[in-house]
């Protein structure tokens, strides 16, 4: 057996059917779409339509609401902070806040503030000013000899009433 003699098994590669190419092709005229009407046209499916049966999105009750005053915080974990300190993108001796994290490229944007989360280990002594922090994050920073200052969230996005 030579490399040039290797071939596929018979029927392993099936030629694709070209539709709408004459009656003799076996997929001509209607092209496998049946008769006329809505389903024969392109872009056929009506989303959520169940043939007249009450659709699922109308059978289920409405729930909840969108709070327009909801605050969205950018989250940062301790391990990410430690990596930035090790890479020398953040100065551990300076006060770390939302602006310094964005300037260093650790966060893309600070949204309504920054929330510190406790995943990972912190070796450096830090002074951090954030808008929120978990108990485990505060404990880890204080254990490393640092301090966490919780700031008030940024000003309300909505108009004054």
Swiss-Prot record:
Spans annotated as Disordered: 1-43
One Pfam family matching this protein: Ribosomal_L27A
GO biological process: translation
Bias-annotated ranges (Gly residues): 21-37
Cross-referenced InterPro entries: Ribosomal_uL15, Ribosomal_uL15/eL18, Ribosomal_uL15/eL18_sf, Ribosomal_uL15_bac-type, Ribosomal_uL15_CS
Keyword set, alphabetical order: Ribonucleoprotein, Ribosomal protein, RNA-binding, rRNA-binding
GO cellular component, one term: cytosolic large ribosomal subunit
PROSITE patterns in UniProt: RIBOSOMAL_L15
A Gene Ontology molecular function term of the record: rRNA binding
Function per UniProt: Binds to the 23S rRNA.
Family: Belongs to the universal ribosomal protein uL15 family.
Subunit annotation: Part of the 50S ribosomal subunit.
Protein name according to UniProt: Large ribosomal subunit protein uL15
Source species of the chain: Rhodopseudomonas palustris (strain BisB5)
